[in-house]
Amino acid sequence: MSDVHDDPLALLHWAQASRERGHHAFLLLDTAQAEASHLKLQSMHVPYASLFEGKREEALPEIAPLLLPLSGLDEQRALVLVRWVSQLGFAAPCLSWYESTLDLHDFAAHLRNFHHAGLSDGQAMMMRWYDTRILPIWMQALTKDQLALFTGGMLSLAFVDRFGEARTLYQSDQVQPPSQALPLDAPLVTLDDRQFGLLVDAGDLDALLTHLRFVIPDETNALPPRTLVEFVAAYQQRAREAGVDDIDRQTQYVLLALYTSGAGVEHPAVKALMQNPPDSLAGYFDALQAMPEEVWEAGPPLWENEHVA
């Protein structure tokens, strides 16, 4: 028997319930966040299917998304696997799990059909929807018909979010048919500009968070992760709305917000600047540095704010 320390996400209980319903339980591991996991799985004698199989990226097994059948493993291997992948899922945005009517071969074939997404200009892009920072945005961005296509063969989809919490993104009693590949591996899903923008914005937020953690590591580490992410997302969006769409100028704006718990950017001088922000980083940086001292003293740093949980 496992306990909460071995299986903090209760994956074994979920897999057992899936089996009792006559379904398969799968884990999906984005090994770009945990490189060379395929070697670990081989040493554990755990079967898997790579979603890169048959794709150009097939030559990169060390970073491939791997589909793992949990419900077909003996108790000991299942416990070892769950203990290991749970640690990975809490450490990096890499773990999701699926209940499906399909077997490993057929479910992997279905998921491979979403390796690329078409764009409105006729181009196609590799779609790393299995990165769990992107997965909820991907599900949100899809139209009703596209979502039905993507969730073919699925009864549920859940993942570990960026805050280390398990979230269910999809659950249904009705199973849609699995997708069928198009000739010449053409994308099954084409994103319009709005959908593409949602996915780009999600990537931009992570890029800005990474940059801020590099610039002020101690300060960002002092904040609860949810507080930091939600605060940065809100002020990045305000910067975008003012036409500040590059990460360097956004960093300067968000730093002012962080160092003043948001009060500094409400100062009339900053609001006036954001009506017509300089296009260059140097010009924008100089304009912020030239602000009166009261701007930078408008509020306490967010990490020293006693009202921040």
What do the PLM-derived regions correspond to, one by one?
Residues 1-62, 67, 72, 78, ...:
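A contiguous, surface-oriented mixed alpha/beta subdomain in the mid-to-C-terminal portion of proteins
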Residues 91-95:
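Short, cationic low-complexity segments
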Residues 69-73, 82-89:
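Contiguous, structured surface segment used for ligand recognition
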